Amino acid sequence: MNLFAEIEPKPQDAISGLTLIESFISEDEESKLIKNIDNQLWLNDLKRRVQHYGYKYDYKARGITEDFKVGDIPQFITPISERLLRESSFTKLPDQVIVNEYLPGQGISSHIDCVPCFEETIASLSLCSDCVIDFTNPYINQKVSILLPKRSLFFLKGEARYNWQHGIASRKTDKIDGQII
């Protein structure tokens, strides 16, 4: 008897170094986090609203310097930072956080996060709605689309961090298996 016969591989299994944790935070934690985020100042420098904590990333220069220090990471983010340290490959508390707001129809071009700017593990927490993110590896000409359920967290390290671009297509709705989500 094969116990694994009915277990289908998940799309993220195709990408070494990508870990997806569904329901990383509770609905209550999400609600409190959104309320705190919405009470902070948003920047409108890009086609989307953004908040920077710790250090401000310079999108034009693709860099961060000590001059871009914008203060400490707020207390409302501390519980998530501490969980990252306990439950992931992070070896120290994050010192930089970027909050991106993507409205329907907005997205972000496919990219690899700036290598000298950010450390070996990147984490992303999805809030408010499900979203499809596309991963592309130009070295092997492969594309993998993954559903990020709201309140899920994904980590990129190793091959996923350095060889796979990730982006969100600018579309009003996402489809999974022909169904609009």
Say what each PLM segment does:
Residues 1-181:
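Non-heme Fe(II) oxygenase metal-center motifs and adjacent flexible, charged/small-residue loops
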